[in-house]
């Protein structure tokens, strides 16, 4: 073997050794599922395995952030070097609640076991779990459909009189920002990675149904706004107060985007600021419509179907939160961070107020405004029938 051949062989061996060492060092332990639900006094199993060959034995110690909620068997084990076997760990639910199971090891192997964690939910009843799922789907459908009674009413009347334009302006901005937040966290990997860095044991809060709902809500609101350009609207317009509020929101969004673009804050923070604007809009967006109904002493032109569906969705959403809090003994999710529950309650209270306006306060005005139940086509048909002048009705829009 000449010198050049010997040198080439040596280089190849060094390269193979480097690759093997790199693979060994990059190999980690992980689990087959990071989220598990177990019933009280029942068992569930998760598996620990290596995503490559380890170059040394790794001692793993499993711990929880709440010792009295569940039992782990085994709580400690050694994962052997070069093994591809699965290590089974049995979880026994002892007390309802949300528990995080995390792994620890010696300093040399902490990086290897960092992906060994499980979010465990100990539930009291499987029936309550299924009931919660049903509630979730029903309120998702109710909220999604709630946009269409107003669209249909506008189309049927060929008029948007009675529908407040400030409400529409706030709504389209709110749902646009909500869509940005959901799409960003669901589709953009850089934002997902940043979220994982900040909340290593957390789960992405945005799911596919959130993305679908927000985009659909934005689309339906755009349809309603387009109707305002083509149908009778009298002297209605967006108020200067609404323009001022929207200008403030625009400054917040633009400044936040500039800070994110200049790397002063992360783009994830920009999305959070957008979500805060959306929450603010949720609180105030119904006020202009309620005031308009009060000044007109009528709900004509404002679809009660929208309110009834929104009330159904909001009520079921709160019931689901209460149901889950009971099933998982997690009342802190409501009383410790009341934002979500409070916003749902606030919206439902507004729905109740609108129902009182429609069915109680301005009931006689609604009954006398029969034009809301008559389409332009009906008017044309009756005109074509050439009835006597005394039988011709006057339509109000």
UniProtKB/Swiss-Prot annotation:
GO biological process, one term: L-cystine transport
Residue ranges of every copy of the PQ-loop domain listed in the record: 132-187, 271-327
GO MF entry, a single one: symporter activity
Topological domains annotated Lumenal: 25-126, 189-210, 261-263, 324-340
Cytoplasmic side: 148-167, 232-239, 285-302, 362-397
Lineage top rank: taxon: Eukaryota
Annotated protein name in UniProt: Cystinosin
Native source organism of the sequence: Drosophila melanogaster (Fruit fly)
Lineage: Eukaryota, Metazoa, Ecdysozoa, Arthropoda, Hexapoda
